[in-house]
Amino acid sequence: MSSSFFIKTKQNPKLAKKGKNTAVSKRKVAQNDGDSAGKSKVPAKKPSSKYNEEISSDSETESSAEPKKRQTNVDYEYDETPQEKKLRLAKQYLEQLKEEEEKKAEDESFETELIAGRLQEQVLEQKGKLQRLIAKDILPPDASEIRVLRGHKLPITCLVITPDDKCIFSAAKDCSIIKWDVESGKKLHTIHGGRKGTEDRHVGHTAHILCMTISSDGKYLATGDMNKLIMIWEAETCKHLYKFTGHKGPVSGLSFRKGTHDLYSASHDRSVKVWNVDENAYVETLFGHQDIITGLDSLSRECCVTAGGRDRTVRVWKIAEESQLVFHGHEGSIDCIQLINEEYMITGADDGSVSLWSVNKKKPLSTVKQAHGCHGDAGLEQPHWVASVAALQNSDTVASGSHNSQIQLWKCGHNYRGLEPLFSVPLSGFINSLKFSSSGQFLVAGVGQEDHLVILLTYSISAGSVRFV
């Protein structure tokens, strides 16, 4: 009886066949050996053909399988099966998706923070509480770094900068309006003034231009003159559109309400008028000042602020409510006014003082007397009167100009509780008008008396500092 140890339950048919062939060959070899050894007296022992067959077959299977297994191991070491390649590519794809999602999440977080910051600024701006602190980074300019634009024949009285900061409009006592290119300093267009008595046939002003303003979208330019007229122009082409009449005295102040085409005007007739430029229509008139109005300004709210000259008052006009708030503070004539934001404003007077106001306080928050120094003999000194003021909106930086031929820059204290001098810029002539650009990158001055200049003081921010260039 054969042992089960040699019985193979599952055998490769090919190997079994090969084993049989091997056994047959061995039997033949054994038979031949027997024949050749027939001469010998001792016969050779005949091995069991059955066991030889089983052992031979099993040995043959192992010997043939080992090289194949070793080859298979080599293949696994150096080659990659399609399944493994798919798995590897899938893992790479998942890693890529993970990295993209993480980057997207970071970008979304940054954008969310940026949007939140902008929304917060907009809310503070609407409330009039936004104050960007940039005054500490502003450095005084060198004289060689100030650009001068020449073109008017008589002293410049007013100027504005377009909302995109690409152009400047200036007007003068020669009744002309010039549009300048900021980058090149060249004239883009000139609206010539006419002679007195040619009002019916001349398109433009025939009297000294006292004030001007531009809408926040840059569409309309408005100018006012000594002839009680308000002219409306298309800012892009300088084409004349409308002529507003109604004031009984020279038009001394103009301002568009931000985001609209509602126009506020002030006059020496002591009134404030409201116009709708889109409709080419007059809206209403407001009274209150006891002397000529010397300046006017407005922002987004449906209200405007005015300086009352010799009545020594500043007034806040609430148009919708048809009411006004009256503020007192200066000892002399208040000649200029500018809003810093919806809650705070700055004024200048002929007593040489510059004052900082809140619309919620009837008295100035801060006043600097003799802001531009004094002139005259000892014991008879008189302060240099302040002819113009400007404010970089929603910041802590303001400027004032005087007939002492200097521009003074000021830093507003925390929550607008004080005024600190930064530096002065000497020029030649009366500083009749000052304007900061919308971006805050440059300041423009309109100079009168003998020079009749538009002067650009531009500055750039680099490594945390600001310098006029």
PLM feature spans:
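Intrinsically disordered terminal extensions that flank WD40 beta-propeller domains
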Residues: 1-154, 457, 468-469
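WD40/WD-repeat beta-propeller blade N-cap
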Residues: 149-156, 193-209, 245-251, 287-293, ...
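Loop/turn segments within WD40 beta-propeller blades
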Residues: 160-165, 171, 212-218, 224, ...
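Structural hallmark of WD40 beta-propellers
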Residues: 166-169, 218-222, 231, 240-242, ...
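Conserved strand-to-loop turn within each blade of WD40 beta-propeller repeats
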Residues: 171-174, 224-227, 266-269, 307-311, ...
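WD40-repeat beta-propellers
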Residues: 177-181, 230-233, 254, 272-275, ...
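Short loop/turn segments that connect beta-strands within beta-propeller blades
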Residues: 182-184, 235-237, 277-280, 318-322, ...
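Blade-level signature of beta-propeller repeat domains, shared across WD40, Kelch, NHL, RCC1
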Residues: 437-469
